[in-house]
Amino acid sequence: MSSREKSHHRRHSSPCNSDHSDHSDHSNYSDEIELYSNKHKRDKDLKIEITSRCHSRSSDSSSSRSSSPSSSYERKCKKNSHKKDSYKKNSHKKDSHKKECSDSDHQDKCSFEEIYKYYKYRMLHDKELMVTGSTSYLCMNNNEIVTIPKNYEVKLNNVSLKKNIDLGYINVPYYVREEGVYILFFVINSNQSSQFSFYVNGLEQPLTRYGNNSGAGQLILRTMLKLKKNDAVVIRNSRSSAATVAADLYVGGSLPGNNLTYLMMKIAPYCQPKCEEWDDKHLSKRKLYLFKKLLDKLLLDKDLMLKGFDIHGTFHRSTGVIVTTDTDVPFEATTNVNGLSWSSVVPEKVNILEDGVYKVFFLANTTTAAQLAFFVNGLAIESTTEGINIGAAQVSLRALLELKKGDILTVRNHTSANGSIEISEKTGGKQNDVDAILTVMRIAPLVQPTMDECKLNDYHKKYYYKFKQYLLNQKCLQIAGSNSYWNVTGDTKQILHASESLDWSNTILQENIWHYQGSPKFTIMEDGIYDLFADLTSNQPAQWCVFVNGTADLTTCFGRDSGGARTLLRQFVKLNKGDVVTVRNYEASSDVIETSTNAGGELVGQSVVFMAFKLSPITECVPCLPHHPPHPPKCDSKDKSKKPK
């Protein structure tokens, strides 16, 4: 039989048993009705279950067989639930009084201005950053006669400027309201040998104990300390040789002037923020474009100081000059000037180009008693008047001043007792050195910015840390205060021939500097402009200089024609990574210089101190050229049918 015949036979074979076939069909039909009925019942039960519990699924086998209707009802239920949630969120947005983007918004619904405000707010309140420069500082002076017995505290009666530092009932202690790294300066004008030191929370800081063996000169304490929030700072007569130290007025001139000056300022956070390795490839092109655009706007924001203490400069002279009464000290040269202006045509004046709080310092070697003061726009700042009663010595002034764009700063021989004063040259040695210097640096904006708390969606919030790391890795920025500093001292006798380096036996602080105790060398690890301070007490006239990579930096050479007192050295110096810095006996008049031991008092004192901190980076920030974002903006989520143009 052929296959075609077999197929035909199969199709027509059923009628042979018609009775049995009919019965079988009827039975199958009944079974189908029963099955449908059971299925309908199960579906009905399943609907009830899904309505009461939208997100649960039946685990039994019958429910598994009916998964298709279950999925349909689940989707419908979820859709209704989503509509309710969306309605609640929209209602919450309408009731909200915030003008910023809500967390439920899509990332593209936050404007650039809102994103900028949010990131700026976060940076202003980030304790690891100092995007507005120094946020804690104090400047005080005293114009009354005072006597200070041994172990008694020093009290000053006038506050020139302060921020985030509170004073006790008698103007001491000084309570620090922000933790951080601080530089502290104290000056007393006394006719007696004296020894003073800093105390923190009632405990003496022995490595800050300094003294002078000779009277009729300024004793200057300077140090750098890490202070915690609410620490109490006091200056005390440690154990001076005299039973009581008197600070006199009318020193070097016809005005009372100041016999005591105190200044402190925060230069860095207590701990430097962690700077992770960075690669722009970690970001999408769109996010990188946003970060660059934010940085461009931040650099133009007058509230901020993203480049550190980048407005600075020194103005100095290396030849002698006579300064008559009521005339200003002229300068011959400048070093590392940025954001200030000076002209050799009018060499006495420094022009301020940006508003701000400025730290100003002046130092000169004179052959006679002298009394000088800072002048702004031709008017004396009386609180800065200071002097010395002897010649062959250094006179110094320091202050924090609020200056505005267009102000003119000068140093004037206003009221010296001898009328004209002579600024000497080749002091303490055989070579030309710096005989008068004015240093100027902006430490903070004139007005600290305040902002209300900003809200932003979660998408942009989570990128703040990455944005912070992006800024920390920009070589042209310094958003976390000074990220490189050191403070070292020496308290033992050192005998130095010409060109020999000082050793430093005590390290108080160091950050991003390679140095070990007992070594004369400091290896720089961060490029930048550094503010260098050195106070060096010797028994003979001295001439000191900072050497960089074995070569004298002549802008840092300072001397003093008398022994028994401190020689001050001060300069802003450009240093590169890998540079090696030392302080040496340059070419003093004496063949040998011997440092003093326990000057001015009965306890161990520091005869030499050397400290520095980075003011600003060397690298210039280059603004990004205007360009379009790498991708067009996404469609608004409310109307996804529209395509971007």
Question: Model-found features: residue ranges?
Answer:
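N-terminal acidic, proline/glycine-rich, low-complexity intrinsically disordered segments
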Residues: 1-12
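Extracellular jelly-roll beta-sandwich "head" domains, especially the C-terminal globular C1q domain
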Residues: 4-6, 106-645
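Long, low-complexity, serine/threonine-rich intrinsically disordered regions
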Residues: 12-32, 53-76, 102-106
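Extended, charge-dense intrinsically disordered regions
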Residues: 13, 49-50, 78, 83, ...
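Long, intrinsically disordered low-complexity tandem-repeat segments
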Residues: 21-27, 81-96
